Structures are given as structure tokens and as C-alpha cells.
Regions:
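Short alpha-helical "recognition helix" segments of helix-turn-helix
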Residues: 99, 153-154, 682
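Residue-level detector of conserved catalytic or cofactor/ligand-binding positions
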Residues: 678-688
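Active-site rim loops that border cofactor/substrate pockets in soluble metabolic enzymes
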Residues: 270-275, 279, 639-666
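A conserved helix-loop-beta module that forms one wall/lid of the active-site cleft
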Residues: 324-385, 641-651
Length: 688
């Protein structure tokens, strides 16, 4: 039997989130997710797949240039960026044979990749100043068959210089449509054409003449945009939300349509929805599908950040977005607009400024004081954010953050120490909250909310804090006229409440709070977005007689040389949820579930500042009472001895002649648990 399509599965790595990690690939798995791309040619499938990974790549060609000092060396070493090194080598004039010699990758693959490069060169030869050149229709068709996106074609033709990216994409799109170059929808036929295909597994391709599916045009379908590749920060939580939305859509009598390309998800199972498009979540591809489907509406709020980012662009093309409007989503996502809105309704937030010069940064820091949170503008999701606690750290970090300029401002925010982080997950209808869940982080604010241990219902919040959070959430929901799911993160210190951010979509804690509360918040939200009247649940978070804990799973043991200190950048790769009769019981279950072992006899304490030593004292006394033998380093050892806690002093490698050495004891596995609080809390490039 012959199959008429080719499938490409590509891993997603997030090694950039770990400081000092070894990027070479080997026998230990380092990827955190994967994508699956389907096309009629290898070239089409691999280019689709490289876009799907979602790391800012547009395909095999037309990406931002990688800076590589030694191409030969880079080709020899297998890293997560290897395919883009091959692209750069081809661009630099390497032949297939040369690359084969250095990489030992089969020539068949390299020849196919070279075909893409040849087409790219042909497109470059038509480069014009600012307007769409008359390129041969055959060349345009060939590029599309090889999986080039409209953006890649626009960039190869030099349209980016004269117009913004959005205009360039639309110019190519309109030209392509006028030339009759349109994708067709093909059905995955697992029966090799021996019987009629049964599945509703669909993909789009330019190598075909007719659609395999009949479109009724009855506007009875609802399209749900999926969550894409699993990665650090967006994983199965958003898939759960998407699946709950699909189930609700089906129950309410609509045709459910899913667009997603992650083979690990439940939403890409063939029987989960009426139609599954196993294809890209890019603006171009989503528009191709929507023009064919002509749906009643599109849901962008259950798939995490990827669909959320498409809302404004889809709205500009008159796509009916269900639930909260695209303008409201933009008002919450855009820092300036959101900040202005909070000021208007009298809600407090940590002070922040987007600054364009070192003098401005120093003036602002003099006003709010250290520590401050610094975020260079050209990065996403906590990547390259840093907490700086003095002027020296700030200057060192800004050197790493590339140039501070008008084009690349740096956002500096006041960082509030010893504040609790509290999350509000809720569903609203026309600006009125109908169901909510307030959960508290066990760690102080400053650890990314995806790495924090979360407790729900909250056990240690003042009643007044909860009351204020509910009031502020109501005001924000009304102001943004929210219909659907949303999440607001708060800082609470005493009863002083500040808003960190607001996301007008389901958050990663929705599945956890839905399960603990036993109310399916996404089902409620989907009904709201479909315009179906819903009852307010009569359940309150204070009615629960148990506690839920969500704890994070880390994979540092697979990542050689990575620094395991947590900070504002998310590093966990999974999570567990446990329920217990009280906090201690639930936390113990959660810690055992993520693989921590209860220490048996020896514990090493090494605490940094005097305040930390005082904070640690009662715990040290308790451990001693339980029969643990305590080891401690320098200052900690003296402090414990002065306060009547018996301990054995151990030494750091900086005093090699003294015994016992802490590291030797760790190597010999004589210590069961280490509590190590460093003096300075800062990420790797600036840590001594």
C-alpha cells in the first residue's frame, strides 16, 4: 500500500531557559515537547514543522541569521539548533557532500533541504524595492508546494523593507489568491485507498487539486484553536481546556473543529471532535481554514498564548471571535494600556517604567529603591528577566541585556520582597463574574507562577485580603467587559494588594482549581462564549473540607551543568496535584509525588544572610528533636551552636585543608538533604 503524505515529527527544546546547560544532544532526552507536520512532500512537511516548534523560526530559510563563529565545528556538534546551522552552511556556499561529511546526515535529507535553499535563491533573484515584483506564477506555486509561508516569500522578495510584516504577508496572500494558488484540504487515509477514508484527520497542502471534504457553509461549526507544542510554560493544562471546550460545543449541538499539531495531546485524537485540522496555528494557515469552514465563531481563549496572540489579527480580518473581544484582549496584554486602565479605576500596581537610557533607569531606581525586576523588551515569558538587588548587579545585567535604546527599551519594575502571590481564576459573562477560584502561592512572589507550589482553597490569607481581591477582580472584569475565562495575578503584603498582570484566557491553574472545586470552569466559560444562559454555581471555596496542592516537577538531573536555582523564569517541566485533609498532609503527598525522598539521618544547613539564619532556627531545633544529625557550614554552624543546636561543622572547597569537606560528603552520599540559601539571588551569567 502507498501513502500519499509524509509526516515529520520534530522535538521542541527549551534549553535557553537554563543557565549554563550543555546544549549537545546525546542519549539523555532533553526535549520537552514535539510537533507533527503533515505534507505531500518532505520539503513541505519539514518547513511546516520548523514553524510549528514556535521558537520564532519561519521555516528552513528566511530566518534571522544565527551568529556562528566556526561553521565546521557547529556542523559537527549535534545541538538543538543544528538544522539552522545547516541552513546557514548552504547559504554560505557549502555543498551537500561537504555538509554530509561534517554531519553524517543522510544525503537524501540534505538534497531535499538544498531544494528549499535553491527555491529561496530563485525568489531572492526577483528582489524589488518595496513592491511586489511580477514573479512567475510557477515559481510561486513551487515555493508553496515546498512549504514556504507567505511571510517567507515576502521576506525573500524584500517586501519587509518597505512595509510592515503584516502588510507584506497580506500582499503576498492577495497576489497568490488572485493567481489561483490555494491550498486544498486532504484527509489522512490510514487505509491506503483500499477503502473510503473514515477519519476526520485533515491537513492542508498545495500538492493537490480538490478538497477531500464537503463544506456545507451552514455556519454551524465552532473552531477551537489548540495549544501547539508542549514546552516550558504551556503544556497539557491548555490541552485539557481545549478538550473541555470541544466536549461542551458538541453537547450544545454545534460542529466542533480543532486546529492543533501536537501528537501527544488528547485534542488531536480522531474521535475528540467532528473535524481535526492537523496543521499550523499561524495566521496564514488559520485564515486558510476559516475561509473554508466559514464558522459560527472561533475560540481563542483555551489554548494558552499562541491563539491569544492571533486574536487582534483575526479580528482585523472580520473573523467572529467568541467571548471577550480582541480589543479587550489587547488592552490586557499591552502593558501601557492595562496600566492606564488600572490607574483609571484606582487599582494599585507595582511601579514600573519602560526606559530607554541608563540615566533614566538610575533615576527610576533611586525613586523606588532596590530590588528591581528588569526585563529587556525583545524577549518573552520571563526569559532574560532578572531581579537585581544593588547597582553593581543592575549594571552587570544590563550589559548582558544588549543595547538599551529607543528601539529596545528596558522595563524596570519595583520588586516587592516578602509578598505573597495570589491568583484569581474566574469566568465572567458580560463583565460580571459568575464563578471564581482564589489560590495562594506557598513561595513568596519572585518565583515564576508556573514553578510555584499552589494551595487551593487558600489557608493563610486574611479575610480582608480575599475581600479586596474579589472587589478588584470585579472592577477589572467590568472594565474589560470579559465574557469567558480569565486569570489575574496579585501581590499581597499585609492587606496591601497590587495587580501583577491579567490574562483574558484560561490559565495553567484552571484544570487544578476545576478539579479541586469540582466545578468545570471551562464548561461554564464555553457556554458563556456560545451565548447560552448559565446559572451561578452555589459552591463557595470556603465550603471545602480539604486542601489541594499543585506542585512542580523539575528535570534538572537530565540537564547537565544547568543551574537549579529558581527565579522569575519558569523551569519546571511538569506538575502534580494532591488533595489532603490539611496543608501539611497535601504538601507531603505532593512532594513524594514529584519524587522527593524523606531524608533519613543527615541534613546539611548552609544559610546566607543573618535574617535567613534566624528564620531557620526553629526548623533546625525541630529537626534535631526528630533525631536528625545536623551538619552546617561556617556562619550557620556558629549561629546554631550559639543558640544551643548541636551540629557538626563542614567546609566548602575554598578551605581545602580543613575536614570534613561538604562536597566530599555529598559525593559519598552521606548527606540526605541540603538546605542551601545563597547570599545573592541572581541568575547564572552574573553569579560569581
Amino acid at each position: 500500500p502507498a501513502l500519499d503524505y509524509v509526516v515529520c515529527k520534530i522535538p521542541r527544546w527549551d534549553l535557553g531557559k537554563f543557565h549554563g546547560v550543555d546544549k549537545e544532544l546525546g542519549s539523555s532526552m532533553k526535549s520537552v515537547g514535539e510537533v507533527m507536520a503533515i505534507g505531500r512532500t518532505f520539503e513541505e512537511a519539514i518547513q511546516k514543522g520548523l514553524r510549528m516548534i514556535g521558537q520564532g523560526m519561519h521555516g528552513f530559510v528566511e530566518n534571522k541569521e544565527l551568529v556562528i563563529a566556526d561553521l565546521d565545528k557547529a556542523l559537527r556538534e549535534p545541538t538543538d539548533k543544528r538544522i539552522f546551522v545547516i541552513s546557514k552552511a548552504f547559504r554560505a556556499g557549502y555543498t551537500v557532500d561537504q555538509v554530509h561529511e561534517l554531519t553524517k546526515i543522510d544525503r537524501w535529507f540534505l538534497e531535499k533541504l538544498m531544494n528549499i535553499m535553491d527555491t529561496s535563491r530563485e525568489l531572492h533573484s526577483f528582489m524589488a524595492d518595496g513592491e511586489l515584483p511580477m514573479i512567475p506564477v510557477d515559481l510561486l506555486r513551487k515555493a508553496k508546494v515546498q512549504g514556504f509561508s507567505d511571510f517567507q516569500i515576502a521576506r525573500a522578495l524584500g517586501l519587509e523593507q518597505a512595509m510592515d510584516g503584516e502588510e507584506a504577508i497580506l500582499a503576498v496572500r492577495n497576489f497568490r489568491k488572485s493567481a489561483g494558488i490555494l491550498p486544498v484540504v486532504k484527509q489522512i487515509d490510514t487505509l491506503a485507498a483500499e477503502y473510503p477514508a473514515q477519519t476526520n484527520y485533515l491537513y492542508l497542502t498545495y500538492s493537490g487539486t480538490a478538497n477531500d471534504v464537503r463544506y456545507l457553509g451552514d455556519r454551524k461549526s465552532i473552531v477551537v484553536l489548540g495549544s501547539g507544542a508542549y514546552r516550558i510554560g504551556s503544556s497539557v493544562e491548555f490541552d485539557w481546556c481545549g478538550v473541555q471546550a470541544l466536549n461542551t460545543i458538541r453537547q450544545e449541538g454545534y460542529r466542533s473543529v480543532m486546529i492543533n499539531y501536537n501528537p501527544e495531546t488528547v485534542s488531536t485524537d480522531y474521535d475528540m471532535c467532528d473535524r481535526l485540522y492537523f496543521d499550523e496555528l499561524t495566521f496564514e494557515r488559520v485564515m486558510d481554514i476559516l475561509e473554508l469552514e466559514n464558522p459560527h465563531g472561533v475560540i481563542v481563549s483555551t489554548g494558552g498564548q499562541i491563539p491569544n496572540n492571533l486574536a487582534l489579527r483575526l479580528d482585523a480580518q472580520k473573523v467572529p471571535i467568541l467571548g471577550t473581544s480582541a480589543r479587550s484582549i489587547d488592552n490586557a496584554e499591552d502593558r501601557d494600556k492595562f496600566s492606564a486602565m488600572l490607574d483609571r479605576i484606582g487599582v494599585d500596581q507595582p511601579e514600573w517604567r519602560a526606559l530607554t537610557s541608563l540615566e533614566d533607569i538610575n533615576t527610576f531606581v533611586d525613586k523606588v529603591g532596590f530590588p528591581v525586576l528588569v526585563r529587556p523588551s525583545y524577549v518573552l515569558s520571563g526569559a532574560a528577566m532578572n531581579v537585581c538587588s544593588n547597582r553593581e548587579e543592575l549594571e552587570r545585567f544590563l550589559k548582558l541585556a544588549a543595547n538599551v535604546s529607543k528601539k529596545h527599551p528596558v522595563v524596570v519594575s519595583q520588586f516587592i520582597e516578602h509578598a505573597k502571590e495570589v491568583e484569581m481564576d474566574a469566568v465572567a459573562q458580560d463583565g460580571e463574574i459568575i464563578a471564581y477560584a482564589i489560590s495562594e502561592h506557598i513561595e513568596f512572589a519572585g518565583v515564576h507562577s508556573g514553578d510555584a507550589t499552589i494551595q487551593f482553597p487558600p489557608q493563610k490569607l486574611y479575610v480582608e485580603t480575599v475581600r479586596r481581591i474579589k472587589r478588584i477582580s470585579r472592577e477589572i472584569a467590568r472594565e474589560l467587559n470579559i465574557s469567558g475565562p480569565f486569570n489575574i495575578q496579585y501581590l499581597a503584603r499585609e492587606n496591601d494588594i497590587k495587580v501583577i498582570e491579567c490574562n483574558l484566557r484560561a490559565s495553567r491553574s484552571f484544570p487544578f482549581v476545576s478539579k479541586v472545586l469540582k466545578i468545570n470552569l471551562i464548561e461554564l466559560a464555553t457556554k458563556v462564549m456560545l451565548g447560552i444562559p448559565v446559572q451561578k454555581p452555589d459552591k463557595n471555596l470556603f465550603d471545602l473540607d480539604y486542601v489541594g496542592i499543585k506542585a512542580s516537577q523539575f528535570s534538572f538531573n537530565r540537564l547537565q551543568k544547568a543551574d537549579p536555582v529558581l527565579g522569575v523564569d519558569m523551569a519546571s517541566t511538569g506538575e502534580v496535584g494532591c488533595i489532603g485533609s490539611d496543608t501539611s498532609c497535601a504538601i507531603l503527598k505532593a512532594m513524594l509525588s514529584v519524587g522527593y525522598r524523606i531524608p533519613e539521618k543527615n541534613i546539611l544547613l548552609s544559610t546566607g544572610t543573618p535574617k535567613q539564619k534566624v528564620d531557620m532556627l526553629s526548623a533546625a531545633r525541630m529537626l534535631q528533636k526528630k533525631g536528625y544529625k545536623i551538619f552546617a557550614t561556617g556562619g550557620s554552624s556558629n549561629f546554631l551552636t550559639e543558640n544551643g543546636v548541636e551540629n557538626t561543622r563542614v567546609y566548602w572547597p575554598s578551605e581545602p585543608e580543613r575536614q570534613p569537606q561538604a562536597l566530599d560528603m555529598l559525593h559519598r552520599k552521606e548527606i540526605d538533604m541540603v538546605v542551601n540559601l545563597s547570599l545573592i539571588h541572581i541568575s547564572e551569567p552574573t553569579r560569581h
